[in-house]
Amino acid sequence: MAYSYTEKKRIRKSFAELPHVMDIPYLLAIQVDSYEQFLQENKKPKARENTGLQAAFSSIFPIESNSNNAELQFVEYYLGAPEFDERECISRGSTFAAPLRVKIRLVIKDKDSKDKNSKAAIKDIREQNVYMGEIPLMTDNGTFIINGTERVIVSQLHRSPGVFFDHDKGKSHSSGKVLYNARIIPYRGSWLDFEFDAKDLVFARIDRRRKLLGTIILRALGMDTNEILDTFFEKVSVYKGEEQFEIDLVADRLRGEMAQFDIVSPDGEVLVEQGKRINARRIRQIEQSGMKKLAVPDEYLYERILAEDIVVNDEVIAKANTLIDHELLVKLSAFEASESIKEFKILFTNDIDHGTYIADTLRADSTGSREEALIEIYKVMRPGEPPTIDTAEKLFESMFFNADRYDLSNVGRMKFNRRLGRTFENTDDPDIKREQSVLTKDDIIDVLKELINIRNGIGEVDDIDHLGNRRIRSVGEMAENQFRVGLVRVERAVKERLSSAESDNLSPQDLINSKPVAAAVKEFFGSSQLSQFMDQNNPLSEITHKRRISALGPGGLTRERAGFEVRDVHNTHYGRVCPIETPEGPNIGLINSLATFAKTNEFGFLETPYRKVVDGKVTDDIEYLSAIEEVGTVIAQADSELDENGVLAEEMVMVRSGGESVRMPSDKVTHMDVSPSQVVSVAASLIPFLEHDDANRALMGSNMQRQAVPTLRADKPLVGTGMERHVARDSGVCVIARRGGVIEDVDASRIVVRVNEDEMQAGEAGIDIYNLIKYTRSNQNTCINQRIIVNQGDEIAGGDILADGPSTDLGELALGQNMRVAFMPWNGYNFEDSILLSERVVKEDRFTTIHIQELTCVARDTKLGTEEITADIPNVGEAALSALDESGIVYIGAEVDAGDILVGKVTPKGETQLTPEEKLLRAIFGEKAADVKDTSLRVPTSTKGTVIDVQVFTRDGVEKDARAKSIEKSQLDNYRKDLKEELRIFEEAARSRISHLLDGQAISGGAGLKSGTVLAESELLEMSLETLLDIQPVEEEIAERLTQIQEFLVDKQKDIDTKFAEKKRKLTAGDDLAHGVQKIVKVYLAVKRRIQPGDKMAGRHGNKGVVSRIMPVEDMPYDENGNPVDIVLNPLGVPSRMNIGQVLETHLGMAAKGLGDKINGMIKAQAAVTELREFLDKIYNKVGGEQVDLDSLSDDDIRALAQNLRDGVPMGTAVFDGAREVQIDELLELAGYPSSGQQTLYDGRTGQKFDRPVTVGYMYMLKLNHLVDDKMHARSTGSYSLVTQQPLGGKAQFGGQRFGEMEVWALEAYGATYTLQEMLTVKSDDVEGRTRMYKNIVDGEQYMDPGMPESFNVLTKEIKSLGINIELKESN
């Protein structure tokens, strides 16, 4: 295989034995593709599909006026360019969005057109581009920048529209009878439910309102009794015989019934005795006997139901749906034969599979006509309003049959038709789509029929947790729905205005107010439950957040209502949703993560890829199947054995079929898994030896990797899974080359690439410039910084990684550090999962992290005047102002401590009453009262750091201070320098290109040279660019190329001038600040945090712990070579938790490190390249797994590779396809270690040997974002709650510890009276007492006199509010 520039620098040894069938798809596709479909930004307006914005517009427009004399038509929309780029938006706190302009056509019709039938003649057409607010744009990495913060819209898993059949599991009724129900769920509109009650009557509910009899809905659809009975029942004819009634005999209908009388054949043989059940054999006998009719006793007809009216001499004797009783039969027998009752029809019903439910419901239904039924429905939907036929009809029509109010959607119609066994054609014809989106009479009848079939025991209820019944709503679709909500509001307003459009001579812009649209979109992105503050701890947490799937949110579930079934793993999750990665706690199972290979299809259902299998031969054709399409397939596992022809080797194969794992013959197999890791999500697939970890611990491991803080120096995992490269690449934190070329110039903050000739477009200079992000704050206050990994002159290809981001190392995800660990108890310091750490780890800054805090100071307008940012602050000594400049803002580079002033600010204050002491002082010293108070921005408690950046934003129209101007100047200078450099590079590139072109060419003059001169490249390179451009070559083609280059340079100069002017305009213009804000100063503090006791650390297997002590290196256990271990872990943490993966990782890590040491030894001994090759070949190709083609690497590549392997040879043990025990043993032996993985250790304090060998190796440890510095907190005098006057709680409020009820009991039990008294009074809510105590301490007196606690006053006030007067009598 060919290795990329970064891959060949450090090749990860893979143990995978299964063939590589398919690349891992782009991990952010679910976000990026969805929003791309919504905007369709890169498509021409005419070529846009009817989705997203286009669909929203075309569903609302055209809007007709109420009087039909004018209409607004939608033509097309355009998105403008955003005003600020992504980085500017983040620093300014604005939204990264593009203006949306819509071309709207106003058509005014002629009312007075003579011909009444034809469409009104068009009188006037006005077209105009209307501004419709701003639409947030997605960044390349799938995020949105809203008000300066990066946010992610999480996809939602909701119930698919369609029809669902279910039952209550016997919980609704006391008898435990199972009651079935059907529910039609549209994409938007009213829900329609049908349900059985305990008496087997069918009821309907609309929008979960009061129950109605189901037949009322049928009557409202225009069906009468006979039509309803015809639709739902088969009929049986009853004939009047000589002595008995006879019925048509259809033998099949008797199956399973109990014979109520002897069934006798025409020749007198008893075929079925009374009381016997009629089975298949007896049915055959009846059919063979040739009987056509069956004589039945009268009792057989009792309780049967008449299918049609019985009419004699135009008089209705019995109505349809009447139960037959003795009286009726006597009446029928009494008629003479002449009076035409030779036969009548009854409904075919029985107790087994033809229930009488609809007939019984009809009998209970008092409405006799459509009108009555409509009014009944109206009463339920609008209780208390007087119904009229007209309004009732309109309401019913609009609920289910009006496309504006009801929309099943494409998905809903597909699911509906599939469930009822009909065909579904996907169409693009808007009219057919509109027809399909509403319900029809047949739809409702078919749903009822299916429900009755299920009640009769034919058919199954649906499983609502099946992924075929739940679909994904991604960003694009949710944004479209919000946009449509805004447009509907606009439509209402426009309709009223349209009528007067002609008379008032209005244009489309006057008619349309875009505020509601902008507000709806803004509300969705800003405050929807699914628009979340991005988790930006590290690249993995970003990717995982974007791939998250939530069942919560608008239109979804709520935590409280969700039961176990919804949260549980379902067999359709396989390859679609990860069974491991989900939060612990109340959201477990409601928030899931997309599996590695999963994607959504056009209907929003999750699909997973499989290889097709034809007659036992596994092909390389890949087919994506949704959970619906997967029904009926037989899927073999990815590790099924194949022979050399790709045919399944074993006769019986382990397969998944119908949701079960079973063995099946190989010729039955239809598909095969693509990869063993297709089951799990990205985070879970980063856990090596996942297959050896208990699922609960794997869940913790997946979740804790997301909390790892990027360390100062990223260190790739020695034991990985091979997935690290994909995550780092797709997360977007690395700089990736757009095109191949040569690195022209490189420094800490920028890379310049001279593009390859064949990748350039015509007439461009072929230079790509990449600016790096340096020390920027992330959402979680961690540090985002990109580091270059290329050198000048390197050749790179498009897609290569040029710079590492946070937590990446040579293009691989690196969340933690490889630590030398030993599993052994050590003086109780690893009790209860504590971790003992060596001081060496701190010294080498292995777990040192940088955190960046943003502190903001806002100067506002107040009632008493404007706040001022200044260095002149009252009553503050010189020392406190030493770090401020003349504008009152801290210098960059200042090291500050808690309480230091960062930005000096004074606020005007009103007149205050002076105390007698203050008056006296004023009189003596003659000092006038200062009319401002100090409200400066200070460093928060327990924070210490370095100022790394300051930004000043000034309101438009307010003069900028010196600091703002200097920041602006330096930004402009930097930008100018960048542009000049850019131009210089372009000119240099042009020079070398021209020299290359003119090399050996004859010239016809120019630049003071004689005609016919031939110049060599070396001479040309010494000439200036002006001279070169002056030369006129003989050859036409080359002259043409020179002209192109010259034109390009002129354009580039213009382009650079406009860029500079634009940047200057943006910088010098005032900022758009909130109302009443004059100035905002943002100060960024970088805090360096070393690891210390109390910090939380974890491995990747859910093995978490807290650092208990940091020991000197010399006291740590060491091995026979004197190498001390870095970390001592408790061996008791392994067996009960069943995460054995950590032990295997430790062993393999030891081997990896040992091999690195061997390579290091060879390099130090200056071994020949051939020797290195040989050893590398042993490592990569002799022990299991994938073959690495070392021959394709040059000697220099091999040397570079060996240099990078000195710290250890990285291993990739993929999920379910990883290293086996034998292979680990072989590598340990190759590295020169015992295959047991254990070593003899010595106590660092005494030098004595420990009793038995200890497992020592390398484990990848993470430092999690639960740092003791953020949690430690102590309170001095601080703020108090307003009502109770008690101290507030929590670190953020600088609060105290609550001394609760039980603590009071403890002190009572000890009889600690005075301690108790001060706890309940002066330390809590005795306002006067605490002031007096403060005063006493100032005066040097050591006593307290407690007063009345405020909570007592609160109590008396509450009692008074109940109308009981309570007074306090003070007695001496």
Swiss-Prot record:
UniProt-listed PANTHER family: DNA-DIRECTED RNA POLYMERASE I SUBUNIT 2
MF (Gene Ontology): DNA binding; DNA-directed RNA polymerase activity; ribonucleoside binding
Protein's name according to its UniProt entry: DNA-directed RNA polymerase subunit beta
Annotated gene: rpoB
Subunit structure: The RNAP catalytic core consists of 2 alpha, 1 beta, 1 beta' and 1 omega subunit. When a sigma factor is associated with the core the holoenzyme is formed, which can initiate transcription.
Homology family: Belongs to the RNA polymerase beta chain family.
Reactions catalysed according to its record: RNA(n) + a ribonucleoside 5'-triphosphate = RNA(n+1) + diphosphate
HAMAP family: RNApol_bact_RpoB
PROSITE patterns hit by this protein: RNA_POL_BETA
Function statement: DNA-dependent RNA polymerase catalyzes the transcription of DNA into RNA using the four ribonucleoside triphosphates as substrates.
EC annotation from Swiss-Prot or TrEMBL: 2.7.7.6
Lineage: superkingdom: Bacteria
One of the Pfam families matching this protein, by short name: RNA_pol_Rpb2_6
Keywords noted in UniProt: DNA-directed RNA polymerase, Nucleotidyltransferase, Transcription, Transferase
Keyword RNA-binding attached: no
UniProt GO cellular component terms: DNA-directed RNA polymerase complex
Biological processes per GO annotation: DNA-templated transcription
